[in-house]
C-alpha cells in the first residue's frame, strides 16, 4: 500500500534503537525523510546511516536528551519543516509503590508526559497552518491496563493520554491528527530490563522469565520493532486522516479488553 507520504519529513524521537527505530525505518521505507534523535550520538548515527543506505532518504541526526528542556531546544533549533512527529522516550524503571519519591515522579513526568507535550506545542501550530500533520505518541499498554511494578510509567503516560484526548479533537479540523500507540512487550532493551527485574526478584533464569511472559500473550511471543513501525507508519499516512485521539494497543492480545 502506498502510504501517500513520500517526500514528507518526520521527526522521530529516541530512534536509535527499539520501537523508535522501528518507526523511523518504516517511515523511511514509505519515502519519508527523517530527523532522528537520541542521546547517544554514535548509535544514532549508525542507525541513520543504515537507513540512508537501505532507503535512500535524507536523514539528519540530532543527539540530545529529549526529556530535558535543553534537549528539546537543541532538536527544535536543528529542524526545518516537520510534517510528522513521533514522540518517544525510554520508560522509567520498574519498582514498588513505596520505592519512589517526588524526584522519581518528576523525572517520569518530564520524559513521558511533559516532553511530548512540549514537542506537540512547538510543532503542531505550523502543521495546522499548512493544513496537514501527524503526531504519534508511543505510550504503553499500561495506559489501558496498569502494571503494578510500572507505577511511574502508568502515571506519566496516563497523563499524556488525557492531554491528547482533548488536544487531538481541537486540532483535527485543521488536518492534524494525534494518536497514541500502546505497546505491550516487544523484543527491545526495555523488555530485557523488565525480564531482568523478574530474574532478580524470583531467582529464575532469563530464558524462564521470557518463556513465562510469552505464555501470557495469546500470540505466544514478543512483538517486533518492524511490526510496531508498520502500525506507526500507517497512523502517519494519508489513509489515517479520520483516526483522531485513539489509543492503539499492540500487545499480541495480552490486554483482554473489548473497548
Predicted segments — roles?
Residues 3, 145, 233, 244-259:
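Short C-terminal tail/terminal secondary-structure segment
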Residues 9, 14-18:
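Conserved glycine-rich cofactor-binding loop
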Residues 32-47:
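Conserved glycine-rich Rossmann-like NAD(P)H-binding loop of the short-chain dehydrogenase/reductase
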Residues 72, 96-98, 104-109, 135, ...:
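Substrate-binding pocket helix/loop in short-chain dehydrogenase/reductase
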Residues 125, 169-170, 241:
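Alpha-helical segment proximal to the catalytic Tyr-Lys
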Residues 136-159, 164-173, 185-186:
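Catalytic loop of short-chain dehydrogenase/reductase
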Residues 172, 177, 243-245:
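Short, small/polar-rich loop/turn modules that mediate ligand/substrate recognition or access, typified
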